[in-house]
Amino acid sequence: KKDIIITAGGKNIAPKNIEAALMEHPAICQAVVIGDRRKFLSAVVAIDPEKAAEANGDLNSFQSSVQEHVDTINKRFARVEHVRKFSILPRELDQDNGELTPTMKIKRRIVHDNWADVIDAMYE
């Protein structure tokens, strides 16, 4: 089954390439693009635990670095595929919380459910 996001404007977007581009950032270990039935794309990203430890768990310290990265990668994609907002998750996505399959693929619906408050805040 293909992962396709259909925006509120009816555009079909394949999130995989955008997520791969987000994960080019040295501190980002996981990225999930959000945007199904939404006006714009956003993303939730998890920071590599070692990098987070180096920052003493201060995930806000990654905010500007990740924002610069997002601005850079957005230039590669069509306007409709631009990530407008992102949130840094306080932990990695994992199998224990049902967010990953045994082969480490992301279960989008579970991520949406588990992080609904974080996701909804980006669209307020």
Task: Specify the residue positions occupied by each region the protein language model found.
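AMP-binding/adenylate-forming catalytic core of the ANL superfamily
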Residues: 1-80, 92-96
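Conserved C-terminal "lid"/linker of ANL adenylate-forming enzymes
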Residues: 5, 30, 72-124
